[in-house]
Amino acid sequence: MKKFFVLAIGALMLAGCGTTGLEGGSSSSDGKVDEKKPSELTVGVSVSTLNNPFFVSLRDGIQKLADENDTTIKVVDAQDDTAKQSNDIDDLIQQNVDVILVNPVDSSAIVPAVEAANNADIPVIAIDRSSDGGELLTTVASNNEEGGKMAAEYIIKQLGENAKVAELEGVPGASATRERGKGFDDYAEGKLDVVDKQSANFDRAKGLTVMENILQAHSDLQGVFAQNDEMALGAAEAASSKGEDFVIVGFDGTEDGLKAIKDGKISATIAQKPEEMGKLALQAAFDHFSGKKVEEKIDSPLDLVTE
């Protein structure tokens, strides 16, 4: 049986996927809204990449709630390309969608696209990663800083203080990369010896290559925090000769990541719930168009999974 250590319950619970009110408000939801039923909405969805199981699950969560409410969904895959994502969002604006749900490739590069949607009076909801500018109706995400701290706490518990560890970082510029790294680094300072940190772009193959290079430079390395499960799986392949005392912690809780924990390939993951995250984002859009106020930040649950 998996051991789940619950960090927090989401600010919004989906009861039968019905429309649930969100308390509080953001500037986008304070003005008068042309109310629409879910079945009358056309929702644009821009995902950073569908070549990652986490974001496939996020897309599926949106699609499931949309199907239950007869909502039209237009999904575009940015393929981890910031220019393509901006063009995709421009296309969605031209198609006069009612709302855009965006999972940014890069939190800075997405700003002009968010501002373009603002200028077209199309509300924007960010998922998993935020935008560094423009006006958002809300951001639906886990507490990434707290998740990074949880990873550091777990590694210290397993290896003790002053253990030599490395970090595999995500896409440079993504808010999740910054926040997970900050949470880990702040807690690890003075407690762990972080000998190296390099970006592997949230990618499994790059995680393998980067981890091989780190191990060549630091043969006495004792563990690694990878900012997502894909990189953790690459790191596990590179460190397969290190044995079970080598600690690998991922982030996301993907199907492949959870299986790797069962198989003893990685030690733990900070598990998000991407399908629920997608549902929460679409539910926020439903609430907005029913005239309800929407929180500026909606938290999605986060757990530490160790077996």
Feature-to-residue mapping (PLM):
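Sec-dependent N-terminal signal peptides of Gram-positive bacterial secreted proteins and lipoproteins
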Residues: 1-24
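Bacterial lipoprotein signal-peptidase II cleavage site
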Residues: 17-38
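Hinge/cleft segment of the Venus flytrap/periplasmic-binding protein
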Residues: 39-41, 168, 172-176, 187-188, ...
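Extracytoplasmic "Venus flytrap"
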Residues: 41-65, 69, 73-91, 95-97, ...
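Hydrophobic alpha-helical segments within soluble ligand-binding/sensing domains
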Residues: 43, 85, 140-165, 206-208, ...
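Short, solvent-exposed amphipathic alpha-helices that sit
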Residues: 54-71, 147-151, 175-192, 206, ...
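Flexible loop/hinge segments that line or gate small-molecule binding clefts
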Residues: 99, 107-146, 157, 164, ...
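Hydrophobic alpha-helical
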Residues: 99-118, 184, 201-259
